[in-house]
């Protein structure tokens, strides 16, 4: 940035901070309604600000010195100081304005008019019973401590004060295994228990410690030390820590010694990744989240009593690691999902159900169908995809072509979701590519159109014909005469029973490019066949609907409903795209489409039937009108 730009930026108007409710309340303060006298000076130069937790004793007296209420035990209170978070807690106006003027350890006397305490209009704090809220009063405040607060619960029932910062960004969560040293004191400072030598071990999410403590620990980093303030509503019973349920609040001092990452990958407890040895780097920034080339050692075991080992790369592969590219379906889905969340050098134990293990993947010897397995995986390292930043146009297109070719291979293997992901990855990268001349622009545009149509082909194979149409539209909106776009969209229209739209697209192909007439004619023949099949299906399914007497119409309706229950089981067509190829690949795929939704299949039949119903109703209405006319004529 140039110096002139920097100077100009310094003089740009700053965004005005929005006014808070507390700011609005402060504007109502009348001079002389709040007076302060320092009884004992505090230490240091700093004072609390919004976002700080303040801990203080408060004694309220009349101007004659009679104690109205107090937190101090010697003045009739419980001995438990008040904890508030400036800017978050509901406070009387006098303290909201007065406490930020104090230093730690200071004792001050605030003389308040009624409107500065509980007589304030719309005061957010209710006055205690029998409190003289219409009187001028003295509030003696001792500011015991203040510090930055981490609010762990919206109702301020759990607040954390950091004593020593931890390491890294990761915090424990369900179902992580936690190792922590924990001590506890009541709100008045009495020690409940001290466990500073041997740490506690517990699992997140199993209610082994009070709820508030678990919430607070969930905000901590490894080796962090903190005080977690927990109010009564979060002091739930737990088997590991016994807390008196009569206590109003407890202060837990916690040192998070270690935690073991345990991840429920599916959220239902079936696919679990448990870290055995930490890796190098920060989670998740240094994990192979993107498609990468990975190198791993692994041991596969059956989930039986013997933990039978069916494969060990160190033994069965002569200590040579397995190397594979993620995002290509080269390993079981559960295996790949977990390795994407590993750090280099990490060892993890993965427990996997059969549908994410070998039921949908070639089974190794010794693994039966429906077998649950465990893998012990060590991520040795990985190579990330080449960064396109700084590459020239030709290099970028070469990289794009490599990824597209991989997608085409996956498509031919019937791995449509994986293929789609490859095409979409290139399309995302293309958002940052700027061709420099007309030739580059044409190459870039043609490639992008090709990728969109490949995505559309994947969606069609996956049964998502509507999304396939929407994707084709991205090409046709910019280039209405794109022949392959018209063909692909026409096929998607056929899949959805939108036969008129399909016919329009195929006819448009012939109009814009005579060389496509053979393909368009073949598509029109296929369309005609589909229409005939749909018509025949409709006649068969609704046979007898108009032959029934009026009293029998309900019975016919029930027949229709019975037929509709089984419509999803009817394979009305073969693969719509037997002759269809991906751009420049020239190879047909060997895979059947997923079953479409009932509504998508049934619509052409229902449309035909509704037309017939309309005709029949019209005939009936005309008959009624003629009858009424004749009757009127002869009466």
Swiss-Prot record:
The chain crosses the membrane at residues 609-629. The gene is PAS1. Belongs to the FKBP-type PPIase family. It holds the Pfam family FKBP_C. Residues 1-28, 569-593 are annotated as: Disordered. This is Peptidyl-prolyl cis-trans isomerase PASTICCINO1. Its EC number is 5.2.1.8. Residues 569-586 have a biased composition (Acidic residues). The lineage of its organism: Eukaryota, Viridiplantae, Streptophyta, Embryophyta, Tracheophyta. It is found in: Endoplasmic reticulum membrane; Cytoplasm; Nucleus. Interacts with calmodulin (CaM). Interacts with RPM1 and NAC089. Interacts with the elongase complex core members KCR1, PAS2 and CER10. TPR repeats lie at residues 400-433, 449-482, 483-516. Keywords: Auxin signaling pathway, Cytokinin signaling pathway, Cytoplasm, Endoplasmic reticulum, Isomerase, Membrane, Nucleus, Repeat, Rotamase, TPR repeat, Transmembrane, Transmembrane helix. It comes from Arabidopsis thaliana (Mouse-ear cress).
